[in-house]
Each structure stands twice: as C-alpha cells, then as structure tokens.
Amino acid sequence: MTAAFYDLMDFDEVLEKYDPVMGLEVHVELATETKMFSASSAHFGAAPNSNVDPVSLGLPGALPVVNAKGVEWAIKIGLALNCSIAESSRFARKNYFYPDQPKNYQISQYDEPIAYDGYLDVMLEDGTEWRIEIERAHMEEDTGKLTHLGGTSGRIHGATASLVDCNRAGVPLIEIVTKPIEGAGARAPEIAKAYVSALRDLVKALGVSDGRLDQGSMRVDANLSLRPIGQEEFGTRTETKNINSLKSVEQAITFEMQRQAHVLDNGGTIDQETRHYQETDGTTSKGRPKETAEDYRYFNDPDLPPVIAPAEWVEEIRATLPELPWVRRARIQEEWKLSDAEMRDLVNANALDLIIETVEAGTTPDEARAWWVSYLSQKANETGVELEALPVTPAHVARVVALIKEGKLTNKLGRQAIDGVLAGEGDVDAVVASRGLEVVRDDGAIEAAVDEALAANPDIVEKYRAGNTKVTGAIVGAVMKATRGKADPAQVNKLIAEKLA
C-alpha cells in the first residue's frame, strides 16, 4: 500500500487549521551483562530462547532480584536529563495478556518512577535550540520478540503462525516519557527527530546503551493529536509504535498530521488507537484500541521491595557522568575551529561521533569530515540507512586515509576500497589486495602511458607549448584510464611537465 491510497491534507493547510501536540515515549535497552530481574545474559544476537531462565519465563515460584547496575544506570540517565531522582521508587505489575509476555504481566514502574521532571535541550537544523520537558524516566523489563509467519505484512494480522523468542524478555529498559510538546507547528516532525537523535547521542555517551534504533535497543512510540488553532483542549491522540530510525520518526509525525487533519476536516473523529509505521511508504496503519492506565490494573509488585536511592549515592553517580554530548560539541567546535554552520552540518548528518572516532584513529578533522560528510553520507542516502549503520568503521576510514598519505592509494582508489568494505569483501587491506587497487609504482609503465597520451593529443601539446599550461587535464585523464586509475596523479603531472619542457 502506498500513501496514494490515503486521503491526506496538504501539510501547509494542516498548519493553517490545526496545532499539533506531540508526546514521545522512548524505550532504551540497557547494555547490562544480565537481565533486570534474573541472572540470564542480556546480550543481543544469541540463538532463540537460549538466554532464558525461570524468572524471565514466568515459571511458578521463580522470584525476581533487582539488577543493581540497572538501577545505577537508570539514575545516571535521569541525572543527564536534568531529572529529580526519587529517594524511594517502586516496581509495579502492568497486567496484560500477549504471547511475548510469559508472566502475563510486565514489571514496570507506575506512580513512583525512579526519575521525574527533567528536560533535554535539542539543536534543530538551523542551530536554534528547543527544550523538551521530560515527564518521567522509569525502569521496566522488556518483552519477548514475536516473529509472525505466513502473512504479507510481517505482523500478526494475516499470519498463519507466530514464533516466540524469550531472549529479550526481562532485558532492562528505561522508558523516557516527554510532557506534551506544544507550539511546534511546522517544526513538529523536525523537533521529534532532533529529540530522538539527541537522546541516542546521550545514552551512547553515558555508555549505558548502544542506542541502535535498527536493532531495537532504542524504540520510539510517537503520540500525536491535533486541535483547532486557538483551542486549549487537546485532541484525541494516536500512538505510532516501535519506530526504528530517525527518518521514520520524522515521516511518521508528518503523515499522522496530514491523515488526522483530513479526517477532522471531513467531519470524522480520531480513534484513540495504536498505529503501525510502514517503512516501505512512510505511512501508518491501524493497530488496536489504545488502553488507558486503568486497563492495565497496576499494583505494586509484592515480590520486589522499594528501590532506595540515598542522596549520597546519587551524588556519587553524578560524579561519574562523562562529558555530555552538548559539552563535547562545544569543545570540539573550539578545538577544530569550526563555524556554527560547519558544526550544524556535522550534527545534522549524525556524523560527529564517527568523525571524532576517526580522528582518534589517526586522521585530521578535515580528512575525517571529507569522508563521512560527503562520500559516506552519500552512500548512506543511496542505501536508505543511517550513517552509523553502514558496515564501515572509523578504523576503516583512518586506514584508507593512511594509505593515501603513504602514496599507496589515490582518492579514487580509496573510494573503491571503501566500496569493497561496504560490499562485505573484508577490511581495507584485504580489499586493496583482492581488487589490486594499490597505486602503480612502475615508472616505466607510467612513462609509456604518458608518451602514448602525448602522441595521441598533439593539439594539446601545441597549446601547452604556446603557454596554456592548464590544458593537461586530458593527458592526465588518458594516463589514468590506461592505468585503470592506479597511477599517482602527482607523478603523472611531473612527467608531463618534464616531457613538454
């Protein structure tokens, strides 16, 4: 199904009539060694149902024990988000039935979260800042993962069978919930994307999660409602679930604004429901009616005591906070002498961390920027993935730069080496060897190619000797073609100048 099958209002017309109100819920999987309430491994990628135990399977008599590292990291996230930390918080049971929830309830936090009343300032594409108010950040356990078979959508509707993998059940989660984001207008999609990007940078800097949207270690639920311009009361919201890329966050918000506006403008009503985001065409589809908190029948978990976080412990954790992303950006901008516009370009391309790591691997800032912001960003756009999801690491880029400096690769050959890494042909040195990319050092072969190119272009030789020294580009191009791009351009230019002197 494509967007053409939906009746949508033009985006500019939406803004003339309606005010969007957003609320974002971001689930962050913590990279602890073990699960939140048991000793099973929490590592991603194991064989299905191999990281399980009586607690995560909900077997009778199994009792949970709180992962202290998970609590510490939850406090660390709360502090970085400028939240107040509760001296005493409690776990609650969120009751619902679904095949990926073996216990038929999820251990979460309800009215006594670990962190509350915070904010995160995010940078927009033009360099302005927008403050996102944080309602709460609470601890909970993740669910299992369902794989639906036999349908066309990959979802449960239309499937003939579903497989359950409980490896993820019980993995520590922090759910970060914003307060309603009002007054964003046309920038609502951009603000949502910037917030998720900033939050991802934050949890990565804290070392508590890899923030991989594509692998599900960070998942976004986007709530959106519209209200007529000037109305105080919020409209009915929808919740688009499990959005897994920055681009998708922006597209999902945009689509829901246009879809809801068309429904309202034609006398319809918005159902309070979940929606599924469709990666293929940027649309959302109907899910299920959205429950209220009362439907989950929360009550304090009788198997778990309150979580006590004395002020002294909180301050000890605060002292361990690393340099936070916005502080690092300011430092890097000053050290690298970047303009505001240059820094915005790096942030907007989500390239800053990759560039910093490439510099740490041995390049200059300018060399690293040239690769990540131009060539590799282009490759990411062509394949429709985030820059960091490319199978190229800062170490790969640093190695290519080193080989270019050593004269073993040209820039063109370096790009071919990166293409090989992207294609899964191995690391840089393996690709250079297998593709035969190293610069030709046979002076005789290069000189012969220069002689042949000069003989084939007498008119250029005549113009050069008449004083127009800028015409040698065609000669250089012919030599590079003859050597399959493996000649050193500096050496070629030197030989041409010597022969035409």
From Swiss-Prot:
Pfam families: GatB_N, GatB_Yqey. The keyword Cytoplasm does not apply. Its EC number is 6.3.5.-. It comes from the Bacteria. It catalyses: L-glutamyl-tRNA(Gln) + L-glutamine + ATP + H2O = L-glutaminyl-tRNA(Gln) + L-glutamate + ADP + phosphate + H(+); L-aspartyl-tRNA(Asn) + L-glutamine + ATP + H2O = L-asparaginyl-tRNA(Asn) + L-glutamate + ADP + phosphate + 2 H(+). Keywords: ATP-binding, Ligase, Nucleotide-binding, Protein biosynthesis. Allows the formation of correctly charged Asn-tRNA(Asn) or Gln-tRNA(Gln) through the transamidation of misacylated Asp-tRNA(Asn) or Glu-tRNA(Gln) in organisms which lack either or both of asparaginyl-tRNA or glutaminyl-tRNA synthetases. The reaction takes place in the presence of glutamine and ATP through an activated phospho-Asp-tRNA(Asn) or phospho-Glu-tRNA(Gln). Heterotrimer of A, B and C subunits. This is Aspartyl/glutamyl-tRNA(Asn/Gln) amidotransferase subunit B. It comes from Corynebacterium efficiens (strain DSM 44549 / YS-314 / AJ 12310 / JCM 11189 / NBRC 100395).
